[in-house]
Amino acid sequence: MPRLAAKLLLVPLLAVMLALPAQAECYVDYKAKQDDPLRLAYGVSQVSDAVCGKPKQAKAELAPRLAADGWTLLKILSSFGPEGLSERKESAGDFYLRY
């Protein structure tokens, strides 16, 4: 009987372990600015799954990437999966998955 119980527990455990490597993709859309002259931008970037749905953490991850090119991240607007990419591509223009 203990072997049967162990096998019954092993099946769900294996299912969970196999599912772990398949992580979802996470993206955010944001607003940023550059000074002198003032430029405003709307963009879309990929962020780590760990910050998905957490605007403050996503901002902390994305801000340094933008700052490297002289941009200041103003706001994370939303986070979404790959299904939301196509509807934002045109609006983001040059800032689509740039950072």
Regions found by a protein language model. Give the residues of each.
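Terminus-proximal functional modules
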Residues: 2-99
